[in-house]
């Protein structure tokens, strides 16, 4: 799962651009450049241009994610969810996914909606209603950005929800405010 996402982002952003050599990337990443850290995560995660090393990918994603780099947070969340490069940890996966989702990443929003949906159908008693509302909210937000399958997932959620729950989900989506990312290049 992570490797496909890594390869996607690598092709989208880095494959067409001239690649800085590994030494220059490490230098910039070591100085705290979140984009360089994210780029190293992609390079190590995909094995494109470097030997594939998921532990190194996770290390560099965490460095960038700690600076609120949205895509690094998303990829780190995927790594924790799948246990690739880091020990599998659903709590950490959810934490990093939420951070990316709160910055407006539609993929993270959809993923978070899916995570809440799983709780709504098989979670502890009492958590189902809150999980349904949160799943609906995150699917709705991802659908508003045109993210594939989100609109259908949002609509499917309504079949198991009361009107009040749907209204609450709509209210939460309407009052959602993005978290501002930190740009490491502004320092």
Predicted regions span which residues?
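Terminal, low-structured helical/coil segments at or just beyond the last alpha-helical repeat
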Residues: 2-17, 149-187
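N-terminal segments that cap or nucleate solenoid repeat domains
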Residues: 2-46
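Short helix-capping/linker turns of helical repeat alpha-solenoids
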Residues: 30-33, 46-48, 53, 66-70, ...
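TPR/TPR-like alpha-solenoid signature
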Residues: 38, 74, 95, 110, ...
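Hydrophobic face of amphipathic alpha-helices that form TPR/SEL1-like repeat modules
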Residues: 39-46, 50, 75-82, 86, ...
């Amino acid at each position: 799962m992570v490797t496909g996402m890594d390869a996607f982002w690598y092709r989208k952003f880095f494959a067409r651009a001239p690649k800085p050599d590994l030494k220059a990337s490490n230098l910039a990443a070591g100085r705290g450049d979140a984009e360089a850290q994210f780029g190293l995560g992609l390079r190590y995660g995909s094995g494109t241009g470097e030997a594939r090393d998921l532990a190194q990918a996770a290390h560099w994603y965490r460095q960038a994610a700690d600076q609120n780099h949205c895509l690094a947070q998303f990829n780190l969340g995927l790594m924790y969810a799948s246990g690739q490069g880091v020990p599998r940890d659903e709590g950490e996966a959810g934490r990093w996914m939420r951070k990316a989702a709160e910055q407006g990443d539609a993929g993270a929003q959809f993923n978070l909606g899916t995570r809440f949906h799983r709780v709504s159908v098989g979670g502890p008693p009492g958590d189902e209603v809150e999980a349904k509302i949160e799943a609906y909210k995150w699917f709705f937000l991802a659908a508003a950005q045109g993210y594939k399958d989100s609109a259908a997932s949002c609509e499917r959620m309504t079949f198991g929800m009361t009107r009040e729950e749907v209204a609450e989900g709509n209210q939460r989506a309407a009052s959602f405010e993005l978290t501002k990312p930190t740009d490491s290049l502004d320092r």
